From Swiss-Prot:
Membrane disposition: Peripheral membrane protein
UniProt subcellular location: Secreted, Cell wall; Cell outer membrane
Signal sequence, start to end: 1-18
Gene Ontology CC terms: cell outer membrane; extracellular region
PROSITE patterns linked: AUTOTRANSPORTER (PS51208)
Protein name, entry field: Probable outer membrane protein PmpE
Family: Belongs to the PMP outer membrane protein family.
Keywords: Cell outer membrane, Cell wall, Membrane, Secreted, Signal, Transmembrane, Transmembrane beta strand
């Protein structure tokens, strides 16, 4: 027997920065281990009378099994009177399936007036309740009691606790006739500290004239999911009210896995319309809902209700401090496409740690018998409907986070206040955007948030972009920035008529024009508009409105509220570029002449230049009669357009974008090639011809200090080599090597991982009968590199890139061997050399955050002239050995520092970097030891490097040679 289970696949997690829409949820089948190997015939693993259990402790059993049990009383398999505990059931788990009762508790139940508690905890194996039913399909009168309701398709108890279980817990395809398709408790249902996933799927309860609440769960007092370590799934559950959960109080707090409410639904009453309303496609609560402190992703997707709240119906909602949260494609027939709030206490929705996104949530407005809506009230997008008469709605976002509404919200009562980013630490963005509205639905009803409620912005950003419209009666900005992007509309309107009317009022302090959004191809400039008053579809300009721009600071920003000069292409000059439109009832009604433009030309990174500004004014002719104006767009006669002119003057990248890391890769290549050229094979002339093979390992460490305002780096290399040697009077060697390198930028996590493949040839000439030794060395190296950049200052973003490099080098050394005092064991040799390196890298483009492209403008060229002395000591025992010590001064004769052209793709700004150069003067050293244990076997060890005011380099090489 295999029980059907599932997992879900979700697209890439959002960081909370981008205006993105997440992927949909995909469900796929997966199998769960059998709870038991026993037969699936009519069977129960418990012996004795299971229908009158009092203080029953079922501890440490191998398994618990109840299949195809039937009873005319409460609890088809188990009936309890006081307390029932399933504790420490072993790995075959707990399995209740296909049990049936015409009363309450399809598997486990109780009879009044008892009030028992059920506890399932510390189970090792899976806990499965499947296909249990409490349903009375015919009228049946118990002669000893009144007709009873039928609730709890799987479990009916006063209190239920499911805690500390180790394997999956699943309630699937359970059915009740009244409430709690899977679980019904008169008081409390608690799920806490479970280690594996928790599943409610395909549970259902249908409506009677008594109730019809909770497709999966009904709790009479409270329901909580706390501190669970894995995922919580609510899939395909159905009921009249609360498609998955119905409870006065519901909380999901401190859970570490993902939380998914998918395709739950509230259908229409089947018996009477006077019963519980069909609200809350996923959750309906009558007091409050708390979703706080959860670390995984939260999805409310494709939930449906016949009435209010496509996903959630609640008097009070607290949705704060969670992982990425998405409300996608939820549907309500009347109001509240995703969330419906109708209480008078404060509700709070805040994207504190990750983004919260509302997208494609719909109010269908179906009224016709054929399931369609009227043309006067067609379907529309709606994220949240607030029907409260008083209270406060708090909407906010933490630092660098976004609360994004791709669907409008509705606050219908002026007694409710709406506060954006009220708390001081809420410095993120609350975004109204029409970016996901397709052309077929591009209508004001899907773009406009219109409310008589007073709105206040205290901190952070209130963003209106991509043709979204915010129409208010009263709006006050005490802090933060009102960001206006492509096609944004911020307007005010007079609410009501006569003496009870509330005049329009908007007070702003700081407007940020989203430069990258306004300048993109096909974009429209934002609009500030005093809406005319409407009297029987005749429109009159509202001269009484107060919409003040006096002393308002105007600045230019990007999508994230930052300086736009590194995210916008300002390569070319802009002449009289329209940036903001104003439509007003009287000349200078908005006092736009007094806007503070001092924020335009401030010091910044990115494109440098100068902004100048001016206004283009137009005035429509006065109509013959105001009664003839039937188009609200034509009621205002006075219009202004802000024109900005930009004169570019170069580009200065910010430190986080400069990235000396790529140029430092060439410096690393140069250092590795330099030490490889100095890594002599210690060839010596021989009295007879010979040839041989060599092989060995190498390691290198470099510490480069910061130089010229560039951070230094640490480099570690290791690898191996193999080659051949041959010769007599003159010798020749050829060596191939592969090295693995990790270059880390100092004081940062940025790094480059490399593989270098090298070929090196060496020739030694003995001239003037050994008086002069001349060595020629050549090298070619090819490198594969992977770079990683980390943006850690409040962003936690990364970028990656792959590129190649080529390095060529050559060296010549002249030695003058001398034997002081006629000794045959001691040799000294002054030497002079010249060593040149050329290195360049390929063009490449990063992927990830702030992508850039890099290419070599000028390659790195470095020429050294080492001059020094070496000394050798040799013995001629049966195991000949030679020790060599070398000390040299190596100045740079010529250097062309690398010029790496970097371009930030968002702004198309280009700059050049040379990395962190090493000092031009250094002292090098070398110690080597060579042993010949056999006539045909030579062991060779070398340690060398150099030290300068900027760089400390160490190179270690061990090699074995077989001569024939």
């Amino acid at each position: 027997m295999k029980k059907a289970f599932f997992f879900f696949l979700i697209g890439n997690s959002l960081s909370g920065l981008a205006r993105e829409v997440p992927s949909r949820i995909f469900l796929m089948p997966n199998s769960v281990p059998d709870p038991t190997k026993e037969s699936l015939s009519n069977k129960i693993s418990l012996t004795g009378d299971t229908h009158n259990l009092t203080n029953c402790y079922l501890d440490n059993l191998r398994y618990i099994l109840a299949i195809l049990q039937k009873t005319p009383n409460e609890g088809a398999a188990v009936t309890i009177t006081d307390y029932l505990s399933f504790f420490d059931t072993q790995k075959e788990g707990i399995y209740f399936a296909k049990n049936l009762t015409p009363e309450s508790g399809g598997a486990i139940g109780y009879a009044s007036p008892n009030s028992p508690t059920v506890e399932i905890r510390d189970t090792i194996g899976p806990v499965i309740f499947e296909n249990n039913t409490c349903c009375r399909l015919f009228t049946w009168r118990n002669p000893y009691a009144a007709d009873k309701i039928r609730e709890g398709g799987a479990i009916h108890a006063q209190n239920l606790y499911i805690n500390h279980n180790h394997d999956v817990v699943g309630f699937m395809k359970n059915f009740s006739y009244v409430q709690g398709g899977a679980i019904s408790t008169a008081n409390t249902f608690v799920v806490s500290e479970n280690q594996s996933c928790f599943l409610f799927m395909d549970n259902i309860c249908i409506q009677t004239n008594t109730a019809g609440k909770g497709g999966a769960i009904y709790a009479g007092t409270s329901n909580s999911f706390e501190s669970n370590n894995c995922d919580l799934f609510f899939i395909n559950n159905a009921c009249c009210a609360g498609g998955a959960i119905f409870s006065p109080i519901c909380s999901l707090t401190g859970n570490r896995g993902n939380i998914v409410f998918y395709n739950n639904r509230c259908f229409k009453n089947v018996e009477t319309a006077s019963s519980e309303a069909s609200d809350g496609g996923a959750i309906k609560v009558t007091t409050r809902l708390d979703v706080t402190g959860n670390r995984g992703r939260i999805f409310f997707s494709d939930n449906i209700t016949k009435n209010y709240g496509g996903a959630i119906y609640a008097p009070v909602v607290t949705l704060v401090d969670n992982g990425p949260t998405y409300f996608i494609n939820n549907i309500a027939n009347n109001k509240g496409g995703a969330i419906y709030i109708d209480g008078t206490s404060n509700s709070k929705i805040s994207a504190d740690r990750h983004a919260i996104i509302f997208n494609e949530n719909i109010v269908t407005n179906v009224t016709n018998a054929n399931g369609t809506s009227t043309s006067a009230n067609p379907p529309r997008r709606n994220a949240i409907t607030v029907a409260s008469s008083s209270g406060e709605i708090l909407l906010g976002a933490g630092s660098s986070q976004n609360l994004i509404f791709y669907d409008p919200i509705e606050v219908s009562n002026a007694g409710v206040s709406v506060s954006f980013n009220k708390e001081a630490d809420q410095t993120g963005s609350v975004v109204f955007s029409g970016a996901t509205v397709n052309s077929a639905d591009f209508h004001q009803r899907n773009l406009q948030t219109k409310t008589p409620a007073p709105l206040t912005l205290s901190n952070g950003f209130l963003c209106i972009e991509d043709h979204a419209q915010l129409t208010v009666n009263r709006f006050t900005q005490t802090g933060g920035v009102v960001s206006l992007g492509n096609g944004a509309v911020l307007s005010c309107y007079k609410n009501g008529t006569g003496d009870s009317a509330s005049n329009a009022s908007i007070t702003l302090k700081h407007i940020g024009l989203n430069l990258s959004s306004i300048l993109k191809s096909g974009a429209e400039i934002p609009l500030l508009w005093v809406e005319p008053t409407n009297n029987s579809n005749n429109y009159t300009a509202d001269t009484a409105a107060t919409f003040s721009l006096s002393d308002v600071k105007l600045s230019l920003i990007d999508d994230y509220g930052n300086s736009p000069y590194e995210s916008t292409d300002l390569t070319h000059a802009l002449s009289s570029q329209p940036m903001l439109s104003i439509s007003e009832a009287s000349d200078n009604q908005l006092q736009s002449e007094n806007i503070d433009f001092s924020g335009l030309n401030v010091p910044h990174y990115g494109w440098q230049g100068l902004w100048t500004w001016g206004w283009a004014k137009t005035q429509d002719p006065e109509p013959a009669s105001s009664a003839t104006i039937t188009d609200p767009q034509k009621a205002n006669r006075f219009h202004r357009t802000l024109l900005l002119t930009w004169l570019p003057a170069g580009y200065v990248p910010s430190p986080k974008h400069r990235s000396p890391l790529i140029a430092n890769t060439l410096w690393g290549n140069m250092l590795l090639a330099t030490e490889s050229l100095k890594n002599s094979a210690e060839l010596t002339p021989s009295g007879h011809p010979f040839w041989g093979i060599t092989g060995g390992g190498l390691g290198m460490m470099v510490y480069q200090d910061p130089r010229e305002n560039h951070p230094g780096f640490h480099m570690r290399s290791s690898g191996y080599s193999a080659g051949m040697i041959a010769g007599q009077t003159h010798t020749f060697s050829l060596k191939f090597s592969q090295t693995y390198t990790k270059l880390n930028e100092r004081y940062a996590k940025n790094n480059v991982s490399s593989k270098n493949y090298s070929c090196q040839g060496e020739m030694l000439f003995s001239l003037q009968e050994g008086f002069l030794l001349t060595k020629l060395v050549g090298l070619y190296s090819y490198g594969d590199h992977n770079c990683h950049h980390f943006y850690t200052q409040g962003e936690n973003l990364t970028s990656q890139g792959t590129f190649r490099s080529q390095t060529m080098g050559g060296a010549v050394f002249f030695d003058l061997p001398m034997k002081p005092f006629g000794s045959t064991h001691i040799l000294t040799a002054p030497f002079l050399g010249a060593l040149g390196i050329y290195s360049s890298l390929s063009h490449f483009t990063e992927v990830g955050a702030y992508p850039r492209s890099f290419s070599t403008k000028t390659p790195l060229i470095n020429v050294l002239v080492p001059i020094g002395v070496k000394g050798s000591f040799m013995n001629a025992t049966h195991r000949p050995q030679a020790w060599t010590v070398e000390l040299a001064y190596q100045p740079v004769l010529y250097r062309q520092e690398p010029g790496i052209a970097a371009q930030l793709l968002a702004s198309k700004g280009i700059w050049f970097g040379s990395g962190s150069p090493s000092s031009r003067h250094a002292m090098s050293y070398k110690i080597s030891q060579q042993t010949q244990p056999l006539s045909w076997l030579t062991l060779h060890f070398q340690y060398h490097g150099f030290y300068s005011s900027s760089t400390f380099c160490n190179y270690l090489n061990g090699e074995i040679a077989l001569r024939f």
